[in-house]
Amino acid sequence: MRLFAFLWSSVAFLSTVQAQVSQTASQTQDDSSTPTPTPPDKYVNIADALRTKTPMATPNRTIMPTRQDPRAPEPPTPEPTYLPTLSPTPAPTPDPGPWVAKWMDHDQVQPFKQPDPVTVSEKAAVKFKPQIHITNGCHPYPAVTWWGETSGGLKTKGAPSAGCKGSGWGSQVYGRSTWVKGVWAIMYSWYFPKDSPSTGLGHRHDWEHVIVWIDNPDIENPKILAVTPSAHSGYSKQVPPSADCVDGTSVKVKYESKWPINHALESTTEGGETQDLIMWNQLSENALRAMNSVTWGDANCPFCDGNFQAKLDKAWPF
């Protein structure tokens, strides 16, 4: 009986074990066919975070240069492009301010050399340059240098020609011309260091001038229509001039004092001397400023801007 009971218990145990094994295999098969549930959004998927989402870069490939055909001509070298050169902005010209007179000894003033005439007016001025005969008194001297230095003149002492018988540097005649009522007027001016009929009389500095009136400077043979020499703030007039008072195209005047009256110009038959001619527009800038600014005591520069037109109007001979 005991043996039978033992065998029965063994068979029951084996049946139980076999049933459990079968149940486990069936459950395993069901689990493999069911998908793994996705974790909730609140959890981070480490696998996704570690996975690279940027596509892999394609590695650089070195392209071998193409060998140039030796028969092909070389391309022309392009011209270089240069930046334009900018002109510097000129500095504003400073105001020179008022002219300060620079006086020097009358016998140290150097004249301007007579330039070659270029314009019609310059050629006419040279063509009709007058002669001056010094009857008594000073000879003409330069009045201004290139740098604007001006003659200091002479005191009225000694003989009328004392200290002024001529400059070792050479002398000068100053010219300026323009149209006046259809007639071409050429003014020729001389400077004298003093105007003294005798010692103690007269004044330091003197300016005298003659105006030659012609029909037209721009024709082959211009004609002298009149001559007006200056005399004591006025003029003597010859319309037309006497043939004896003209040498070719050069009128003749004399500088003379009839005591006790000061010196003046008048037409003459006597020949005289000539000087280097410098026209107004040929003077240096400093010389122009000096001539327009300097006061000459009792004498007046006739061809400066302040006097030129008024002198022409007063000397009008027609």
Curated annotation (Swiss-Prot):
<comment type="function">
    <text>Secreted effector that contributes to virulence during infection by P.capsici. Induces distinct chlorosis at 3 days after inoculation of host C.annuum leaves, and all the chlorotic areas gradually turn brown and become moderately necrotic at 7 days after inoculation. Caused only small necrotic areas at 7 days after non-host N.benthamiana leaves infection.</text>
</comment>
<dbReference type="InterPro" id="IPR008701">
    <property type="entry name" value="NPP1"/>
</dbReference>
<protein>
    <recommendedName>
        <fullName>NLP effector protein 9</fullName>
    </recommendedName>
</protein>
<keyword id="KW-0964">Secreted</keyword>
<keyword id="KW-0732">Signal</keyword>
<feature type="region of interest" description="Disordered">
    <location>
        <begin position="24"/>
        <end position="43"/>
    </location>
</feature>
<feature type="compositionally biased region" description="Pro residues">
    <location>
        <begin position="73"/>
        <end position="93"/>
    </location>
</feature>
<comment type="similarity">
    <text>Belongs to the Necrosis inducing protein (NPP1) family.</text>
</comment>
<dbReference type="Pfam" id="PF05630">
    <property type="entry name" value="NPP1"/>
</dbReference>
<feature type="compositionally biased region" description="Polar residues">
    <location>
        <begin position="55"/>
        <end position="65"/>
    </location>
</feature>
<keyword id="KW-0843">Virulence</keyword>
<feature type="region of interest" description="Disordered">
    <location>
        <begin position="50"/>
        <end position="93"/>
    </location>
</feature>
<feature type="short sequence motif" description="Conserved undecapeptide motif I">
    <location>
        <begin position="185"/>
        <end position="195"/>
    </location>
</feature>
<feature type="signal peptide">
    <location>
        <begin position="1"/>
        <end position="19"/>
    </location>
</feature>
<feature type="glycosylation site" description="N-linked (GlcNAc...) asparagine">
    <location>
        <position position="60"/>
    </location>
</feature>
<dbReference type="GO" id="GO:0005576">
    <property type="term" value="C:extracellular region"/>
</dbReference>
<feature type="compositionally biased region" description="Low complexity">
    <location>
        <begin position="24"/>
        <end position="35"/>
    </location>
</feature>
<keyword id="KW-0325">Glycoprotein</keyword>
<feature type="short sequence motif" description="Hepta-peptide GHRHDWE motif II">
    <location>
        <begin position="202"/>
        <end position="208"/>
    </location>
</feature>
